[in-house]
Amino acid sequence: MAPKSACKNALAQLAAELSSASKRDTSSGSTRNSAPELTSLLADLLLSRDDVPLEDLEATTARSHLAKGVFAACKLVPFPVAEVAVRLAVRAIMRRVVVPWQAGENFSMIQRVREAFLRLVDDFDNASKTELNAPFTQCSEYKDLIGGWLTQFGNAVVLTMSEQQLLDDAGSVLNPPEVLAPLVERYPLLIDHVMVQEGMDYLGGKLQSLVAYHALLRCATRPHENGKVPVLAALTMVAEYFDPETKPAYRKVPQKAVAAFDLNLTDEVVSSLVYDQAAAPVVQSEQPVLPQSESLLFTEVVRTRNMLALVQPSATWEGSGAALRNAAGDAKRRQQQAARGAGMAWRCGVDALFSVPMEHVAMNVPAVMQMLHEPPTDIPAEYERALSLYATDTIDAIAKFPDLAASSGTEAVIRSLALRGFTKTNCERYLFAAEAFLEPQAPGTPLHDFYAAVIYASVVGLAAHSLYAYNQHTIFYPEKYSRVLKKTVEAHAYLLDMMGLAISDALISLRAFAPKPPHQAFRTVRDTLAAVVDSVETGAEEFSDLIVSDYVQRLTADFYGGIHENEQWLSERDAAIRQRMEIAAAGRRETDSAGRRPGLGFHELAALVQGLQIGGKEPKAVVEYATAPAGAASAGATFSALFAAAIVRDVMEGAAAIPFEADALARLNKALSWLRDFGLSWNMPDGSHYRRRVIALQAAIHPFVTGKIGVDAVTVKQARALETAMGDLYAACEYSFQALPPPYVGGLRKAAAPSRQHSPLLAQAYTNAAMGDLGVLTKTLAKSAEEISKTVRDMVSRLLSARDLFSRRATASDKNAVTIDAAGPGGTVLGTWEDESVMSGLWKTVNFTEAAIRNTERAVRELEATKRETQDLEESYWQLASGRDGAGNAAQPSESLYQQVAAELVEIADARNAVVVRARSLYRAIAGTGLKRIRTFVKAWRLFLKAERSLAKQVVQQQDLIDALDPSRS
């Protein structure tokens, strides 16, 4: 069928077509045995895959006209066909209704769906009474199902909207499956409905986002023997959930969390978390010289007792120092900060890290980040043991995730990660730091094991949290699952390898997050659908088979059902249907009168088939032939086989010759619908199941016919699906050809199987896919390379400025000021600044460069995420170039295009790998040399400043000087 207009109500269009066809058949005096056009339109209604927007369903006129059109058609089509259509029409419409749950107005949406559905049922009831003089009773159970599901969904929505009540009722743990399970378990027959799938996905995402939140909230508001744990849990929760850009935006900081934070933040806890740099006699070797941004943020929160300062810093607070060009203004701001106590700093180092229970270590973000930025040296033996024990405990806990999920669900895994400090935000922080700054350690050392545990937990945690944002029981999840693993686990494969870990280790731990489609519910729909259509009296077996086989095709292609299992199910059903039809045929032969017209002979039948016009009306002789007693089962099978071997094959050959263009595909789809529906009105048998293959071919071209996907955007996977569907249809035609009696075979020519070598349709589909794949990958490479190049240029420019500063002469005064001259004797004086302004400017360079490194690594990971896709495409095109199909079967040699594409994919992969390696080498070199030297310089200045302050006493003793200059004596 031609693509529908985007502005046209789909229901109104079908209603108009039904009305027109009914008028034509009525005026021509058609009977129930001769309404092929109406039968075809009813098949379109029951088989359509087009979405029905809620607004279309709410359109009163369109809805009413469609109901009238359906029942007007049912008066003219064969009774068994009408019975199937009446029983399934409402479901066929509701199955495709799309509801915008994400809009947030859930209660009004539920009411709109309920009202539109009830009015649809009323319209069908009124039309049934008008056209058939009988009430519409076939929808009572389905009506209860829809109403019950909407009520259940509304109850679940109430829980998510009343968040505090939900958390209070949850007690110790929040268990989303308790809320979501009834939506499937009580209503399995609705599982294939679009609004149900999208509703489960939407609601699951909202509920599951609260699991880690609830666990952290309980930890932050409950007493703990270590007073720092509730404080760190509160900060972890704020960082994860209360950033202004974090969704859902409706969540607010619970008042009890604020009260608990203030209560837990005693003077003792504060002093154990932060210290006053000015009061400290020297800088501890494990303390940061000028703290990282995380340290400054966390310190500000504790100092001001303001939780939200972690994600919403005050406008006057600055954590990154100042540039030399703004030194004067910065000095004034620094004085204001000092007056407010801005000299506080977060306690870092292994002793601070392990001052909380081992299972909460990763909540101490500044301490972990400092470990990743600057590996500690001279670690005491007791802390080496602690590092090793932490690594063992963390990796063992993650290894048990599959067992934990099996007993308590994936939410237990999410809770475990969150309470260990591995929230999604923290995982991203730790991985960024490891990617940019981590210095490799000797394998087997405690520090190496600690880093391995943090990286491993961060990779697994990032993947787990990303996957848990979706409902793993919906049909949308498998694609998201694959995409998330590419962007998380596969993107960090090199980090895992550097730590002596493999991707398989992480994937095993994430096994519980694999897709889990509700196969039993889908099978229930399949079995129930078959039972409904099979309960209709004999005469609509082929029409019913269309409905059932279409669902099975969607079950295997879209719902990830087992192919072998469903093929076996179809085979068993076919046997039962054939047996029923044979019994019915035998009964008719016994009761039919002997005076009926005999079946057509060879010449008449051949002439009848030759006279068929593709897309035209079915000749009345077809019906007469089919209903003749002498031409019963065997004669009907002969005609069906001849139709498939001649007409269907002609259409297939014509399809292979058309261009891969939207208009041509629309015309092909219309011809395929005619093939699919030919003979349905008189139950023409289909021994080769060519109708099923036609449906599969229509499914392959459907996205391009409707415009959901442009023909230029076809992928190699979709091109393969098209080739497979055409090959299956050809096989069905060949089966019919072989089943023909000898007299018919001689008049038919042999036909070649469709192939990309001889079919413009397939060749152009693959060509478009090749150009599209190359274009997308080339654009991705160019964009990432440009982004990386720009960031690296900025980094190098900043470091060159720092190097230029170090090349100049600097003269210090006794007023804590530095005068900087141009390099060389007699250089021009550039200016005089406070020494702290100079150091702050240098540290801003460090902070800027670190941020640039993180941005570069993000771009590198996005680029590296295309690795698997490129490999898959490369393999596909080499197969095409070698003349082999997806199963490895030999075919004819292919055009050189596929070889060229495969070769270019290799070049793209090489270019990508070169960019990744060079970018990582460059920013690691910058982090390991330039930044390290600036840090060392600033650290030396801080040490000297502390020493100077420690000497600022009325009476200075010799030991004071020794202590000040030797930090190890502190």
From Swiss-Prot:
Record keywords, A-Z: Host cytoplasm, Host Golgi apparatus, Host nucleus, Virion, Virion tegument
Coarse class of the protein's main subcellular location: virion
Taxonomy, superkingdom: Viruses
Cellular component annotations (GO), alphabetically ordered: host cell Golgi apparatus; host cell nucleus; viral tegument
Any one Gene Ontology BP term: virion assembly
Region (Interaction with large tegument protein): 476-970
InterPro entries linked to this entry: HSV_ITP (IPR034738)
Record's subcellular location: Virion tegument; Host cytoplasm; Host nucleus; Host Golgi apparatus, Host trans-Golgi network
DNA-binding among keywords: no
Function noted in UniProt: Plays an essential role in cytoplasmic secondary envelopment during viral egress. Interacts with the capsid via the large tegument protein/LTP and participates in its transport to the host trans-Golgi network (TGN) where secondary envelopment occurs. Modulates tegumentation and capsid accumulation at the viral assembly complex.
Quaternary assembly: Interacts (via C-terminus) with the large tegument protein/LTP (via N-terminus).
Family that this chain belongs to: Belongs to the herpesviridae inner tegument protein family.
HAMAP family documented for this protein: HSV_ITP
Protein name, per record: Inner tegument protein
